[in-house]
């Protein structure tokens, strides 16, 4: 399965490179975020049927068999060696360094819970800082999910009789 994914990703990346379009251009043409387009082309996200025609219009050489492959639920995984890439390493370092403070602020603002990475939007933007130098803006926009108190009366398996085998 991993080899099939690697082959698909290689084909998708080749098509993107051949198109000469950036992730931002593809995002604009499809109505998706730039990161989601990158996730699609890395088989880390699921191509929805209503989005497939937009992606096909943005990448006209995208063959139907790859579109059908992209519409299957992906194997969301990563190569553990990717952490050695300096950009990925620094992202991980930033999350680890700021994570505890971010968690504390989420809890202070929302209560005991987490930010979803399922109902989640992510984008990368380029802005100029006050010093005129380029800056990277990462936006993580996740739904807040409160932790629930585990009451037995809310536990579906306990609210109806268990079937005997």
Swiss-Prot record:
Residues spanning the membrane: none
Record EC number: 4.2.1.104
UniProt-listed InterPro entries: Cro/C1-type_HTH, Cyanase, Cyanate_lyase_C, Cyanate_lyase_C_sf, Lambda_DNA-bd_dom_sf
Choose any GO biological process term that the UniProt entry carries and state it: cyanate catabolic process
User: Which spans of this chain does the record mark as coiled coil?
Assistant: none
The active site is formed by 90, 93, 116
Q: Which domain of life is it from?
A: Eukaryota
Q: Which GO terms describe its molecular function?
A: cyanate hydratase activity; DNA binding; identical protein binding
Q: Which UniProt keywords apply?
A: Lyase
Region (Disordered) residue ranges read: 1-20
What reactions does this protein catalyze?
cyanate + hydrogencarbonate + 3 H(+) = NH4(+) + 2 CO2
* Top EC category: lyase
Family under the similarity heading: Belongs to the cyanase family.
Please give the HAMAP family that the UniProt record associates with this protein: Cyanate_hydrat
Function according to Swiss-Prot or TrEMBL: Catalyzes the reaction of cyanate with bicarbonate to produce ammonia and carbon dioxide.
Which NCBIfam families does the protein's record reference?
cynS (TIGR00673)
Q: What is this protein called?
A: Cyanate hydratase
């Amino acid at each position: 399965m991993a080899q099939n994914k690697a082959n698909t990703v290689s084909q998708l990346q080749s098509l993107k490179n051949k198109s000469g379009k950036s992730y931002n251009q593809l995002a604009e043409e499809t109505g998706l975020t730039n990161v989601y387009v990158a996730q699609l082309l890395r088989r880390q996200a699921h191509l929805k049927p209503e989005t497939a025609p937009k992606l096909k219009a943005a990448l006209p050489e995208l063959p139907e068999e790859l579109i059908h492959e992209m519409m299957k639920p992906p194997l969301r995984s990563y190569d553990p060696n990717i952490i050695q890439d300096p950009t990925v390493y620094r992202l991980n370092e930033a999350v680890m360094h700021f994570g505890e403070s971010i968690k504390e602020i989420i809890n202070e603002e929302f209560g005991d819970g987490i930010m979803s990475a399922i109902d989640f939007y992510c984008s990368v933007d380029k802005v100029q800082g006050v010093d005129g130098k380029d800056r990277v803006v990462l936006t993580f926009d996740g739904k807040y999910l409160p932790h629930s108190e585990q009451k037995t009366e809310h536990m579906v398996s306990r609210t109806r009789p268990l079937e005997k085998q």
